[in-house]
Amino acid sequence: MRRSTLYSLIFIIILTAFAVWVDLPGSRNVFGRQAEVVEGLDLQGGLQVLLQARHVGGKAPTREQMEEVRQVVEQRVNSLGLTEPVVQLQGSDRIVVELPGVKDPEQAIRTFQGTGLLEFIDAGDTPLQVGTLVNTTLGPAITNGNQNQNSTKNGTPTPGTTPTPESTPQANQTPVAANVTPTPEDPQFQQALQATPPEQLQRTYTTVITGNDIANARPDFDPTTGEPVVSFELKPEAAKKFADFTTQNVGKYLAIALDKKIISSPQIRDPITNGRGVITGVTREEARTLAIQIRSGSLSVPLDIISSNTVGATLGNDSVQRSIRAGLIGIGAVALFMILYYRLPGFVSVVALAIYAAVVFALFKLIPVTLTLAGIAGFILSVGMAVDANVLIFARLKDELRRGRGLIQAIDVGFKNAWPSIRDSNISTLITCAILIWFGSRFGASVIKGFAITLAIGVIVSMFTAIFVTRTLLQVVLSMVHTRNLWIWGIGKNQLPEPEGRTLQPAKSSRTTQA
């Protein structure tokens, strides 16, 4: 065995052992990061929601606005603590949200759908009724844009609140149900509209600070009562502004509005100078939702739900089992064909194929790649393409053996002649994968993107295993199997080369016939 072949074999053994270790069930700590299987929506179950931006004032949102909204939605979704959520733009005014493994779909929808515009407004000498609508200096409660749009029916429970530090008496508020994106077609909006005095809608209230002025917000518990609250801390500039306002308006009312609906209207008993406060009267889930909305910022464009689809985990597990079964049957059939047709090289290709599968699956866990049914299909297709590369190599190998070359020379020449075809076909496939990945990212087609990513990874690894692993294994086998019987190399008796000296060659004349 040549020294280079020995070194290559050692490298393959180490690589295979590492890949198998990563592939073992469970999570592995590799280079400071966790390597684990990330299942997509269709495998572990979850929620898929299609959101559409509302055309306010009859104007469609710009691309920059949609990207800003997508980033805010992504921040809110990431705060849910889910594994590999997907938030993608689809077309010019839609956003696709995929939440694998979400436990409470309704709570998740409330988290990212609401605009989350939190306003602290000057209510003056009269408290505003909880659950009513207000016009503020940041915009009216009713616009032409939301009058012409259909509303979703998913309401957001909205809490009563008290924007006071611990020293300030808390107002006694009752939580009310408030739609996060109220529109006139929504029954909850109609209820809030009917409860709103007409003179209140004719007035514009001054917004003192907004949720964007809050530096941090978190769900918490009142140390005295043990009730859930949202604790917040204002940014330095806003804290000074808030302190000046509360100092000048002691005895008056400061209302809090979420998406133009009043959720609290406490009286200012003392100046609030420390820039800290709490929002009370919330449930545990409502506190979490409101804190996420405050931290991520408000949406510049309201969003409506076009469709939502919940995938059960049972369906996902059944799909996984069927996909694995189909893949094993397909790989087994291919392995049997390779061994029967190519014999010893076919057996070597099966070993290389097993190494290929181990390396690819390890990469899926290390990157990580979110596995979906389409992604599994892409992986199975890449297995077929890996076998196709071996078929090309072995066909060239048999051609060289038929021409009477020795085994070592036939292997070298066979791989050299097969490489251009393997390279060109795989590059064409990778270009197609790049187009599919772009298409999936641009139009929110995560299924297509997942298929293309797994296929591309498989194709890249297949070029390595076909050229490097298979060639090394063949050279190792050749050094161990000392036989001149070409049958085990896939050459039948009727395909053997003619014995040397038995072939007829045309005679070459060195003389020139002259007329």
Curated annotation (Swiss-Prot):
GO cellular-component term (any): plasma membrane
Record keywords, A-Z: Cell membrane, Membrane, Protein transport, Translocation, Transmembrane, Transmembrane helix, Transport
Localization per Swiss-Prot or TrEMBL: Cell membrane
Role of this protein: Part of the Sec protein translocase complex. Interacts with the SecYEG preprotein conducting channel. SecDF uses the proton motive force (PMF) to complete protein translocation after the ATP-dependent function of SecA.
Bias kind Low complexity: ranges: 150-169
The protein, known as: Protein translocase subunit SecD
Record-stated family: Belongs to the SecD/SecF family. SecD subfamily.
Ranges of compositional bias, category Polar residues: 170-186
Transmembrane segment boundaries: 6-26, 322-342, 344-364, 367-387, 427-447, 450-470
Organism: Thermobaculum terrenum (strain ATCC BAA-798 / CCMEE 7001 / YNP1)
